[in-house]
Structure formats: structure tokens, C-alpha cells
Amino acid sequence: MVAKPIVRVVAALVEQNARFLITQRRPEATLPLLWEFPGGRVEHGESDKDALVRELSEEMEIEIEVGDKIFEVTREYERYFIELATYTCRLVRPHIRPIKVHDYRWVSREEFAEYEFPGADQDTVDKLLKGK
């Protein structure tokens, strides 16, 4: 049996006024129209923090300052494992332009339950809500 590859992914936990930034995946994407924390794959030779800066710039023209890693989860999917590291981030330039995301929202802790997330992101939501 062939081992499933591990895909390193990073996510930004951006909080403003007790609301968190989430993005909606495009209809043609894997796991279409689910919600997630903004971010993406770490490319070979790239650091987590560099990947976050690049991904948010590409996806939404957001300029961020990356802080500390606060959560890391691993989740098995059909063809691979996702290793998701979530970092606190601060918007340097607050203008958001959804280029490579379908939509975005600012949600409170109480509103997370209204959105459907992929497994790894849901694990992160659960940790966030438990304060861990």
C-alpha cells in the first residue's frame, strides 16, 4: 500500500473587533464553497510565514504581518494528509479584494457554527472556541 503524501498548509487567524476573517472556496476548487481561514499550501523551500504572506497577497491582495503559530492539526483526507498550521496575523493594509476566493466574511465566535468548514479548518475552529 502506498503511503499518502503529507501536504503542508498554513492559515491566517486575522481578528478585528472580535470578528475573524474567513474565506469561501471557489465552486471549481476541491471541497467547493466550504469556508476556511485564509491561507494555502507551503511551496518547497518556503517558510510557513513566507507562504502566508504570499498566499494572502495572491488570493485577496492583503498585506499581513505574521505573528505566532497558535494551532497545528493533521487531518486525513481521501488522497493525502493535511498538516495545517495556523498563525495569528495582523492586517497591515486593510483593503480586501477577493481575487482567488469566492467570498469572505468577518464572523464572531458565535457565528462559526453557521458556516461549513473542511475537516482541518473545523478542527482549528474547535480549538479556537475551546481557547486551546
Residue ranges and their predicted role:
Residues 32, 80, 97-132:
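Nudix hydrolase/Nudix homology domain
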Residues 63, 72-96, 103-105:
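Active-site-adjacent beta-strand/loop module that shapes the phosphate/pyrophosphate-binding cleft
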Residues 48, 52-56, 69, 87, ...:
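Hydrophobic packing within well-folded, soluble alpha/beta domains
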Residues 1-20, 41:
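Conserved N-terminal beta-strand and adjoining loop/helix that marks the start
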Residues 59-66:
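Short secondary-structure junctions
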Residues 19-58:
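Conserved Nudix-box catalytic region and its N-terminal flanking loop in Nudix hydrolases
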